[in-house]
Amino acid sequence: MRDAQVTPEGARIRWVELPGDPRRATRVYLHGLGASAAPYFAASAAHPALAGHRSLLVDLLGFGISDRPADFAYTLEDHADAVAAALEAAEVQAADVIGHSMGGAVAIVLAARHPHLVGRLVLVDATLDPVPVVHGQPGVSGIAAHTEEEFLAGGWHQLRENVGPHWWATMRLAGREALYRSATHRALGTEPAIRDMLTALPIPRTYLRPEADQPLPGTRELAEAGVEVVSIPDCEHNIMLDNPEAFAQATARALREA
């Protein structure tokens, strides 16, 4: 485990680091809302198709093994800047960044705001658009339907039933302010929009999606902007857990070095 101070007040991001060939691109794995990088990505990072690179399995501020400051805003921009500070401390440049769900949105903002840190992007069913809020739904939609006061006063108790035991295993580790503010800012989106940031990036970008899902909105526009959209069979939202072999092979193809 490694760590770096990422705020003036002293909050620290922590990550699990796997060693690899220093001549090859470093890989950075970013988890989704209420998750943690190692439980979601460790097997993939060690898969024969992806192993051999220095790999940082980073827990976003407020989640997993990272600190949970209650005075942090937890916007997508704030998350991206905190990750950037950690990568600078780790002496990472031009990394291959793999981001799942909200972590994919953070990865896009990271690439837009700190372009020297990101060489290629793999987005794993990442959220590109604002999310409608609906009471009782799991994840971003249900959390953001509360006010912060409601959520902190007891609304968070509903999450255990709504998200199920697997997601709850890591969600219970999150700071409650971090969970609420991250979800709310993800629901609202950014300015410029995440999708617009993605299409404007000048780096190789791949978007992995579950094959059984409805067609990804704006697929043609993404393709015209150079974003490769790849459908993965036999999986739901957690592609790397549901079909680890197909995920590893698709990610390896996206990150194949010339």
Report the location of each language-model feature:
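N-terminal cap/lid segment of alpha/beta-hydrolase-fold proteins
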Residues: 1-12
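Conserved HGGG/HGGXW glycine-rich cap/lid loop of the alpha/beta-hydrolase fold
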Residues: 11-67
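Active-site loop/oxyanion-hole signature of alpha/beta-hydrolase fold enzymes
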Residues: 54-98, 249
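Gly/Ala-rich beta-loop-alpha elbow adjacent to hydrolase catalytic centers
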Residues: 99, 103, 107
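Flexible "cap/lid" loop of the alpha/beta hydrolase fold
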Residues: 108-113, 117-150
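Conserved alpha/beta-hydrolase catalytic His-Asp/Glu region
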Residues: 132-134, 138, 145-203
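Conserved serine/cysteine hydrolase catalytic core
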Residues: 176-234, 240
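Catalytic active-site module of serine/aspartate enzymes centered on a nucleophile-bearing elbow/loop
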Residues: 227-258
